[in-house]
Amino acid sequence: MDLFRVWSGMDFLAWRGMAYTLLLLNFVFACQLLLLQPLVSALDGQSVDAAELFERASQSIKVKRYSDALDDLNAAIEADPALSEAYFKRASVLRHFCRYEDSENSYQKYLEFKSGDSNAEKELSQLHQAKSALETASTLYESKDIAKALEFVDKVVLVFSPACSKAKLLKVKLLMVSKDYSGAISETGYILKEDENNLEALLLRGRAYYYLADHDIAQRHYQKGLRLDPEHSELKKAYFGLKKLLKKTKSAEDNANKGKLRVSAEEYKEAIALDPEHTANNVHLYLGLCKVSVRLGRGKDGLNSCNEALNIDAELIEALHQRGEAKLLLEDWEGAVEDLKQAAQNSQDMEIHESLGKAEKALKMSKRKDWYKILGISRTASISEIKKAYKKLALQWHPDKNVGNREEAENKFREIAAAYEILGDDDKRARFDRGEDLEDMGGGGGGGYNPFHGGGGGGQQYTFHFEGGFPGGGGGFGGFGF
């Protein structure tokens, strides 16, 4: 037990001594660092002098690493304020960034060392041209003179200031107004390669993808921007606007599939109204609205919607098909055949070919005489109504009763008789209603029937007796009896 106490006491004394030793060593090390710091700084300054910084900046400029070059030039000037060439190169780099005021100051500083230097004077003139061109391009953009604005940006500003973010973003805006969305995507790609967190570039690139109807990629750009700045108003507007459009479109499509056609039609209209300029997406919305309108039997609405779709994409086969269906509803047979024939030539879809056959049949039927119309009756008229109409019109247009306009009366009378020959026969009437061809159905009284054929030549008299029947008179009235 006594030995244990002795050992414990010795252990405590040893640990305490070790702790004091470590504290002393740390204190000495800290003092050494403080004493050596000025020497280290001096050595650093000697290791990278102004000339070396200038040379490194020159190499960075060659590979277009302008930000690195600017840092080294600033350091070189700080190390040697009399290094005139550093001012000249810094002025040039600042001009590249379109930091025109700072650039001009550096040129002027260089000219204090090298008064009248032709290269500096030339670049200073280019600076003024670029600055003026950028201001002009901005004004032209505001006044919607897009072509001229692009010319100033491309041919002046970006020639003398190729690293000018302001000019690059202005160019993207001009391309967006010109609806050159692929060009806008390409240009913003260069900007984001240099600065992946450029919020304006993310917004513009997202909008370009949006207007190409590449909504997933557009959404990703908006989301990245909002992660960097959750309160960015334009990014929020673009992001939530896209979400609303997608939601409304899906609802319209779902309701169309469920047969809720009236609701679907209204939702398609609302989706289109959210962004009337979004043609790449609206072409599909107009087509959806056209289909729903045709299913509702709204021929005029369907025609208008499909016209809008075809104004955007004249080769959209399904829009041609649906417009043909809308024209069938409007009884524009020739227009329907034209649209459906064009669609069928570019598609093997059996539904389109069936619709074309239906349209061609309707067109053919429309060119035949409408026997119902000639007798002034409906297509659902009974046989007794047909006979009654025939008797009335035959009496009205009998040539003997129309001596003053005999030729017209004979033509009308012939049509009336032909109409009765078709509609008074159940089989012929059914075939006519189905659109089938009947021999001589539309010509010269139908089936060779001529109420004026019989005894006697021209000028014969026509007599009708309606008592107990309606036989032809002395002029050989074809023997129709009831």
From Swiss-Prot:
Keyword match Signal: yes
Coiled coil ranges: none
UniProt keywords, alphabetically: Endoplasmic reticulum, Host-virus interaction, Repeat, Signal, TPR repeat
Signal peptide: 1-42
Chief subcellular location: endoplasmic reticulum
Effect of gene knockout: No visible phenotype under normal growth conditions, but the mutant plants die rapidly after challenges with the turnip mosaic virus (TuMV) and turnip vein clearing virus (TVCV). The double mutant erdj3b and p58ipk is male gametophytic lethal.
Keyword rRNA processing found: no
Tissue: Expressed in flower buds and flowers.
GO annotations of cellular component type: endoplasmic reticulum; endoplasmic reticulum lumen
J domain sequence ranges: 370-436
Segments annotated as TPR repeats: 50-83, 85-117, 130-164, 166-198, 199-232, 245-278, 283-316, 318-350
Protein's cellular compartments: Endoplasmic reticulum lumen
Subunit structure, as described in the record: Interacts with the helicase domain of the tobamovirus (TMV) and the tobacco etch virus (TEV) replicases.
Function field: Plays an important positive role in viral symptom development and is required for viral multiplication and pathogenesis.
PANTHER family: DNAJ HOMOLOG SUBFAMILY C MEMBER 7, DNAJ PROTEIN P58IPK HOMOLOG
Protein name: DnaJ protein P58IPK homolog
Source organism (scientific name): Arabidopsis thaliana (Mouse-ear cress)
Gene: P58IPK
